[in-house]
A protein has these predicted regions:
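Conserved AMP-binding/adenylate-forming
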Residues: 1-44
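Structural core segment of the AMP-binding/adenylate-forming
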Residues: 4, 32-99
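Conserved S/T- and glycine-rich ATP-binding loop of Class I adenylate-forming
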Residues: 12, 30, 61, 121, ...
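Helix N-cap/beta->alpha junction signal
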Residues: 16-19, 64-65, 120
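A hydrophobic alpha-helix adjacent to the NAD(P)-binding/active-site core of NAD(P)-dependent oxidoreductases
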Residues: 52, 85, 116, 147-150
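Conserved pre-ATP/AMP-binding loop-to-beta segment of ANL
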Residues: 87, 105-126, 133
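Structural motif detector for alpha-helix initiation sites
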Residues: 97-99, 118, 141
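Conserved AMP-binding A3 loop
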Residues: 122-148
Length: 150
């Protein structure tokens, strides 16, 4: 994440068709450094990606296979905050998530992880927007802990 310029408080989009290990690994990396995950439905339109990524100020977005890269990249020119789209699957010469996995920033990662507080924002989950634009639901680390403990 740090190699992508992602740091504490930055928003990172995630779009995949199915649950997969890469999603979990990426989501944990996001939370570990104090960044904020923004999962998005794979079935929404480019216009809806544009709306969500602008509202959340998504900096980097990880996408799965198929048309997801194309749909997100259509919105990229209208999302000032979005600097990079990363693929979980090989898709031509597009950036691949494994290109950014390394241990060169371990000390910085550990330092950042120690600063994450339970009341820090962990994720913003968007509703389906059946009566208008999708609405973001902001969840802290404590919200997630409470669900796990119950």
């Amino acid at each position: 994440m740090l190699d992508l310029g992602v740091g504490p408080g930055d928003k990172v989009g995630l779009v995949v068709y199915k649950n997969r290990p890469e999603w979990v690994i990426t989501d944990l990396a996001i939370q570990y450094i104090g960044a904020v995950g923004v999962p998005m439905y794979p079935t929404i339109s480019s216009r809806e990606y544009e709306y969500i990524m602008n509202e959340a100020e998504v900096k980097v977005c990880f996408v799965g296979m198929g048309d997801l890269y194309d749909k997100v990249s259509l919105a990229q020119s209208k999302v000032e905050s979005l600097k990079k789209i990363i693929c979980f699957d090989k898709q031509g010469g597009r950036p691949l998530w494994t290109d950014f996995i390394n241990d060169k920033n371990l000390e910085q990662v550990e330092s950042l992880s120690q600063k994450v507080k339970t009341d820090d924002l962990a994720t913003i989950i968007y509703t389906s927007g059946t009566t208008g634009n999708p609405k973001g639901v902001m969840l802290t680390h404590q919200n997630i802990i409470s669900v796990v403990e119950s």
